[in-house]
């Protein structure tokens, strides 16, 4: 039997030095709609909800606010990525600190990263099999190509296995989305073939608790190498 979901600590939740998560709020509407206007994002989707329209994005976020309270421990969370301070500004501030012109608090303020909207990460029930959970991510293209998807995916899996006590978790992606499939393999998932997903066919991946425990003892570089070989 799956235990009741323990409450999450107060947001934002740190997934890594580069990534933090929080609940969506009304002020995220424009960022959410803007992300979905990008044809590179839309090309990867296996649903057709018109989130590029601000009114639809606003209703979606309002629904999430209710979802968070009705389904504690699961949800679609806003991802914020850290952008480092300008190098020249930082160097100037550090010199000023060394010269005694600014104090520690002001230097720390300059050194702090800027947190900017990066997309979302999700841990939700599978629509076609509500007893199961799936992880997902949707990121702005300027956040692609790094390790944010892995950082967020590992946070979601810790939540699913350690926080919620799940025995397995699923992942889905467009069959043509090789980048998403690779990310799922690096996280430890294994492909199971095609499966129905929101009225479409999607590539399905599965990860069990025992494999998760073994896989995530490996350094990430080893997981990357093994996932590439498995593909």
Indicate where each model-derived feature is located.
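Conserved active-site alpha-helix within GNAT-family acetyltransferase domains
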Residues: 150, 176-192
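GNAT-family acyltransferases
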Residues: 1-142, 159, 163-172, 187-231
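Generic recognition of short, well-ordered alpha-helical segments
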Residues: 116-118, 134, 148-151, 182
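Conserved G/P- and acidic residue-centered "switch" motifs that form tight phosphate/ATP-binding loops
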Residues: 28, 147, 177
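Conserved acetyl-CoA pyrophosphate-binding loop and the N-cap/start of the following alpha-helix
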Residues: 143, 147-156
